[in-house]
Regions:
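Short phosphate-binding loop-to-helix
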Residues: 67-116, 127, 133-137
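Catalytic donor-sugar/metal-binding loop of nucleotide-sugar-dependent glycosyltransferases
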Residues: 203-224, 229-233, 237-246
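Short, high-confidence coil segments that cap the C-terminus of an alpha-helix
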Residues: 57, 112-114, 142-145
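Short active-site oxyanion
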Residues: 56-61, 146, 221-223
């Protein structure tokens, strides 16, 4: 179990950092997914290990409504001092109130205020601990930034359907077609892979801010977000490929 740092003085280097990993028991697309074994450990354990290995988190907290997930997370090194209330573990529960609840309960138990929150989604396992460390370091060294997260580069064209059924191309200031290398890339926000934000954003019910910094990646595997059996199969295949090619 991660233990809190004994003492903190003022200054950016002494900022208290807590990683929060939300993992509820209910899953319609892939029942029991957070406990399914993947690469030799339960799915939930991957994110716990990444947070610990980043070396920047004073606490690694898993918020769950499920005793089995709680036990698996604890075995991986997480802090799991409470079970999440049922009303915050429904199919349509947004992430923001879950993070706020976890932060407030952790602070009440620890008797401290955390300055930076690291948010990790357990269904996103293709991350590097270094990305977490970079996100936290950005907030510690750049006070003008309120959040830092991973974003995947893409050169694809995006469209949105309007209320009247018509279609509008997003970002029509870009050249519509042409060689991929000549087009300005877009970056898809992937906060669940790795993100760090000022705790006041969480207290305000937000998980991104207005003054962001992005960790740019171009990583196909990190786009795998495990929600159903096919996603899980892709993750298994990607892990095997990485194991053979590293």
């Amino acid at each position: 179990m991660t233990e809190p740092t004994a003492s903190h003085n003022s200054g950016p280097d002494k900022a208290r950092v807590i990683a929060i990993i939300p993992a509820r028991g209910g899953s319609k697309g892939l029942p029991g997914k957070n406990l399914k074994m993947l690469g030799g450990m339960p799915l939930i354990a991957h994110s716990v290990v990444h947070a610990i290995e980043s070396g920047v988190c004073d606490r690694v907290l898993v918020t769950t409504d499920n005793e089995e997930i709680r036990a698996a997370a604890e075995a991986a090194g997480a802090w799991t001092p409470f079970l999440r209330e049922a009303e915050l573990a429904q199919d349509l529960t947004p992430t923001e109130p879950v993070l706020k609840d976890a932060l407030e309960r952790a602070e009440a138990l620890d008797g401290v205020s955390y300055d930076i929150v690291v948010f990790l989604q357990p269904t996103d396992i293709f991350r590097e601990p270094e990305w977490i460390a970079r996100a936290v370091d950005t907030l510690k060294t750049r006070p003008e930034i309120d959040c830092c997260f991973v974003a995947n580069k893409t050169h694809k064209n995006f469209w949105v359907q309007e209320d009247d059924g018509s279609w509008t191309r997003v970002f029509d200031w870009m050249a519509i077609y042409g060689p991929r290398q000549t087009r300005k890339p877009l970056f898809r926000e992937d906060t669940g892979i790795a993100s760090a934000l000022r705790s006041e954003l969480i207290r305000a019910g937000r998980r991104t801010g207005d003054k962001a910094e992005i960790i740019q990646i171009d990583n196909t595997a990190s786009g795998i977000d495990i929600h159903d059996a096919f996603d899980f199969h892709l993750a298994e295949t990607a892990l095997e490929w990485r194991k053979r090619n590293r």
